[in-house]
């Protein structure tokens, strides 16, 4: 039924549950599994007094490198966890807006199922901000499993 799966992880407890579910399904379905982590770009806001903030380029590069280093560590741990259960997985690191990157990689890979963790936000906050899982479920062209 599902021959290619993509699970998105961010190091949270919910994404760990999503990974467990994806590994279980991939093993059961004998499906290919891709594990995706999206590192967000650092956001710099301006000062309300001057309207200008100077951030040295090397500092921004250091932040990007640390974000990527942490993301690669999360991916490596996830790959090891999958291997322990007998599932070989590929890992993908991307930068950008998580929902957008998840959908792009799902389309690129031709996946038949996307697995994401629920962020657990609800009510007004979700209505105002939205959640990655909600955006992915609304915009995906393939089934999405949201794990709680």
Swiss-Prot record:
Domain of life (superkingdom): Bacteria
Residues making up the signal peptide according to the UniProt record: 1-18
UniProt keyword tRNA processing present: no
UniProt-listed CDD domains: USP-like
Keyword line: Signal
Pfam families hit by this protein: Usp
Family (UniProt): Belongs to the universal stress protein A family.
UniProt-recorded name of the protein: Universal stress protein YxiE
UniProt source species: Bacillus subtilis (strain 168)
Gene this chain is encoded by: yxiE
């Amino acid at each position: 039924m599902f021959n290619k799966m993509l699970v998105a992880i961010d190091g949270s407890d919910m994404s760990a549950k999503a990974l467990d579910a994806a590994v279980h399904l991939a093993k059961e379905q004998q499906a290919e599994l891709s594990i995706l982590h999206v590192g967000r770009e650092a956001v710099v806001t301006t000062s309300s007094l001057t309207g200008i903030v100077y951030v040295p380029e090397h500092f921004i590069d250091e932040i990007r490198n640390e974000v990527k280093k942490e993301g690669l560590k999360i991916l490596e741990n996830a790959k090891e966890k999958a291997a322990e259960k007998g599932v070989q997985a590929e890992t993908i690191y991307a930068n950008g807006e998580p929902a957008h990157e998840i959908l792009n990689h799902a389309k690129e890979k031709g996946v038949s199922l996307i697995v994401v963790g629920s962020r657990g936000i609800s009510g007004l906050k979700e209505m105002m901000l939205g959640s990655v899982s909600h955006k992915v479920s609304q915009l995906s062209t393939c089934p999405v499993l949201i794990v709680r």
